């Protein structure tokens, strides 16, 4: 039984590592003015690496990666083994939303109050209605508390998690979400 669990944990930890790796490379690309998509495509052409899970974006979330990366490090600790790479992945991923918020503040010159911000997609990945550990769960309330006026659209029609947050509204189309926006977050 433990082998099957460890296979699942290790597989998901590896995929989480790939996502976190490309997000860190995206940070470097931003500083060096290189397009991360070009890097992702080039890396993906290498058969040893492959193109899946090499798309820079928000922190990983969902029901598996956060849970399984924590589970494998917990299992390792029980057996007095240090999984420093996976611990670093967890730490980097946890910092990703903070880094994205910092970029938003920079783009808007720290003037968040009354800025119209559009979120296109709020789930942890495309084509799902799963909000578990989605970056938007951190970012939207934080921006709202600073006075941003937020509209969001998600093609899955997801609209429940933000209903009670001041200055946040679900809209029924991309067009309505981006109309008059000072900043669009995809």
For each predicted feature, which ranges?
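Structural/interface elements that position substrates and couple domains in central-metabolism enzymes
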Residues: 1-186
């Amino acid at each position: 039984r433990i082998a099957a669990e460890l296979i699942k944990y290790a597989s998901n930890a590896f995929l989480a590592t790939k996502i976190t790796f490309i997000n860190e490379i995206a940070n470097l690309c931003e500083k060096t003015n290189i397009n991360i998509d070009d890097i992702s495509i080039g890396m993906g052409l290498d058969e040893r690496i492959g193109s899946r899970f090499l798309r820079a974006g928000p922190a990983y979330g969902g029901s598996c990666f956060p849970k399984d990366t924590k589970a494998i490090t917990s299992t390792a600790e029980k057996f007095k083994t240090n999984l420093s790479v996976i611990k670093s992945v967890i730490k980097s991923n946890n910092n990703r939303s903070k880094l994205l918020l910092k970029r938003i503040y920079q783009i808007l010159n720290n003037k968040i109050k009354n800025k119209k911000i559009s979120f296109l997609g709020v789930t942890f990945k495309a084509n799902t209605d799963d909000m578990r550990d989605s970056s938007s769960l951190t970012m939207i309330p934080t921006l709202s508390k600073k006075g941003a006026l937020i509209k969001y659209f998600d093609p899955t029609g997801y609209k429940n998690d933000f209903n009670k947050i001041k200055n946040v509204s679900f809209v029924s189309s991309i067009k309505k979400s981006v109309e008059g926006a000072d900043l669009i977050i995809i």
